[in-house]
Amino acid sequence: MKGLGSNIVRSLPNGARLVCADNTGAKELEVIAVKNYVGTVRRLPAGGVGHMVFVSVKKGTPEMRKQVLPAIIIRQKKEYRRADGTRVKFEDNAAVIVTPEGTPKGSEIKGPVSKEAAERWPGVSRLAKIIH
């Protein structure tokens, strides 16, 4: 895992629903925790593009539903600024399910993957068809 190049806005707090962008059988995920989050009193933990979160599978195949799994956020609706001054936002909030080490469990990723997530997680960048 590598450090993030730009300052990502943490716009997905606990309880946020994400689209599962891989072929593991999960369709919708809910964020239940953010790994390595250090916050303040009464503030919800939140993650953004490139962060590892723990999710509960809300919709999907019967084998996948109700499981708690680690995932990496690859797209977010809230725009964030890159170091070169450009602003990036996507049309949905999406994540891919991974192992605790960061290698994806699925064999393909649907849709674009943010450059920040691809740089930080080499396993995700190997499966990404579009890096934006």
Swiss-Prot record:
What keywords is this UniProt entry annotated with? Ribonucleoprotein, Ribosomal protein, RNA-binding, rRNA-binding
Per the UniProt record, one Pfam family is Ribosomal_L14
Protein name stated in the entry: Large ribosomal subunit protein uL14
Gene behind this protein: rpl14
Q: Name one GO cellular component term.
A: cytosolic large ribosomal subunit
* Gene Ontology annotations of biological process type: translation
- From what organism does this protein derive? Methanococcus maripaludis (strain DSM 14266 / JCM 13030 / NBRC 101832 / S2 / LL)
By sequence similarity, the record places it as follows: Belongs to the universal ribosomal protein uL14 family.
CDD domains linked to this entry = Ribosomal_uL14
Function text: Binds to 23S rRNA. Forms part of two intersubunit bridges in the 70S ribosome.
Q: How does it assemble?
A: Part of the 50S ribosomal subunit. Forms a cluster with proteins L3 and L24e, part of which may contact the 16S rRNA in 2 intersubunit bridges.
Q: Which GO terms describe its molecular function?
A: large ribosomal subunit rRNA binding; structural constituent of ribosome
